[in-house]
């Protein structure tokens, strides 16, 4: 039986649009309305691999398209700078889980749209073969046998989601159970690349389907990543577009850096600084364009109360910015815990005062009772 692509059905989340979701992503042709959450949602930062043409299309004329997506979904979106000689760029999208998923659904919708004035060029772009093989589709193009409404065939799009290798197994699940469930539930196709992106510990998860369906499956993938208990405070390297060395070995941000700073962060605050699913530290790395490595804690480590953070970049000002932001986050966390501690102490003092007053009142009542009895006896006599 053929796999049918399915239009998205809204997930069990309130759909009154308080964040101004894009109307384009909610059309029937693109697979259903995007979901919008009204309650506080956990935050995530997703990264997509783009070709130069795709990046230009998402940016739009004078940045109009990316600005619209950013404003409509209340997210932070940025695209890495062009690296001479490289055919790829990275899009980062950060915000709460649902808004990020909606924004990426809008991105798929933008990439699906073709220029009616130049259909031949659009066809040529779709069939282009890239030297950087990660840009080539892993999944075959959708066929007429896989869709019930042939008019919607061209509305099927795809994303190349960059995911740390430590999360891939959780997304796939035991014997592929999780990824099969996502495919069947949302009417999409999903596949993980076998190869790692150059000089990194990340792989590509390619998702193919209607924009609305991709939105919904991204929400579940985000939840899997955020709840992944096997998160390692590791030396996992993030991928950045770069050229290879003449020897054939890729140049990674960590090996090409000429500026390096090491910070020791108290172990008590490491979890808060890194954030859930390493989300906070990833956002910091993306914003400052640096590579930040959190060293693993060894059993024989002499500084057992501290963890080493290593910041590297070929731009000294970026390293300094990352250092100042990291220390600011640390000071904020320390101050937050101190304030909480003071509030607890104040509450304990208030409770003690109330108890003392209650004891005093009880003592006075006990003292007044015999006096009343004595007065009553005198009146009777």
From Swiss-Prot:
Function statement: RNA-binding protein involved in the correct localization of transcripts in the cell. RNA localization is a widespread mechanism for achieving localized protein synthesis. Required for the asymmetric localization to the daughter cell nucleus of the ASH1 transcript, coding for a specific repressor of transcription. Overexpression inhibits translation of the ASH1 transcript. Involved in the stability of transcripts, like the MTL1 mRNA. Involved in structural and functional organization of telomeric chromatin and regulates silencing at the HMR locus.
Biased segments, Low complexity type: 15-33
Underlying gene: HEK2
Region (Disordered): 1-34, 357-381
GO molecular function, one term: RNA binding
Designated name of the protein: Heterogeneous nuclear rnp K-like protein 2
Sites bearing Phosphoserine, chain numbering: 358, 360, 362
A Pfam family it matches: KH_1
Subunit composition and interactions: Binds RNA.
Keyword Disulfide bond: no
Source organism of the structure: Saccharomyces cerevisiae (strain RM11-1a)
